[in-house]
């Protein structure tokens, strides 16, 4: 795989959301969702944003991605702002396109990365399904295709919003291991949203926990596990208890 496109490894991401409010609709009053959320992300780190359902995790990710501009604050992605990829909860594959075509569509015609698509499809375990349409794939296979499409772009920033939700445990575990393999071979800055604390420990180098209600950063913790320990259930549970002991 070719190196990242001009990655400035010395430039962190700066996030400041002073206020994010959902406007009043009908009988529903305006709702303050995020307040004074501020943090910095080092390049090529894997930061997990966690917290209870409905606390604003996905909203925060949408703001960082530039999909939601109705907020008070500032997002500074530095030179990486033009090299950002978002992997959503749903795989978002075009039903009329094959696995290969769904991956290729994110690249311009003639892009040299197009030559790497077959190898990427093989790496995510879909070599025999390259010409299959999404309806013929299991949800786990569709999410493998989504990972391939995200990493073929060689992004400098990768945002992931609960991409392994609704999967059985063996499938989710397999996909988490695949994600780590891809990330280690192609380092990039990852912001990963999940409500699953065990998943947060297995993946993150750092965890940001949002508080419920008018969410702010309630906890900022470093995960002290090596790669082997992340695959050890006992080690993950011990680290999970250490980090989340007071919550």
What are these regions, as identified by a protein language model?
Residues 65:
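Helix-to-loop junction immediately C-terminal to a conserved catalytic motif
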Residues 152-156:
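A short, proline-enriched helix->beta-strand linker immediately N-terminal to the Walker B motif
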């Amino acid at each position: 795989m070719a190196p990242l496109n001009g990655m400035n490894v010395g430039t962190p991401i700066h996030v400041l959301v002073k206020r994010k409010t959902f406007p009043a609709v009908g009988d529903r009053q305006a709702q303050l969702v995020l307040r004074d959320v501020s943090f910095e992300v080092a390049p090529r780190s894997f930061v997990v944003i966690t917290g209870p359902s409905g606390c604003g995790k996905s909203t925060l990710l949408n703001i960082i991605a530039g999909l939601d501009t109705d907020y008070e604050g500032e997002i500074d992605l530095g030179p990486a702002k033009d090299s950002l990829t978002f992997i959503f909860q749903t795989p978002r594959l075009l039903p009329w396109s094959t696995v290969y075509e769904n991956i290729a569509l994110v690249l311009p015609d003639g892009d040299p990365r197009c030559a790497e698509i077959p190898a990427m499809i093989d790496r995510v375990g879909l070599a025999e399904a390259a010409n299959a349409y999404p309806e013929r794939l299991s949800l786990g296979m569709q999410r493998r295709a989504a990972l391939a499409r995200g990493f073929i772009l060689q992004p400098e920033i990768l945002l992931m919003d609960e991409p392994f939700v609704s999967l059985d445990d063996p499938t989710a575990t397999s996909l988490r291991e695949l994600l780590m393999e891809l990330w280690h071979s192609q380092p990039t800055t990852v912001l990963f949203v999940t409500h699953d604390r065990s998943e947060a420990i297995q993946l993150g180098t750092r965890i940001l926990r949002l508080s419920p209600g008018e969410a702010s950063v309630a906890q900022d913790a470093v995960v002290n596990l090596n790669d082997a320990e992340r695959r050890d259930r006992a080690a993950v549970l011990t680290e999970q208890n250490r980090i989340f002991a007071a919550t």
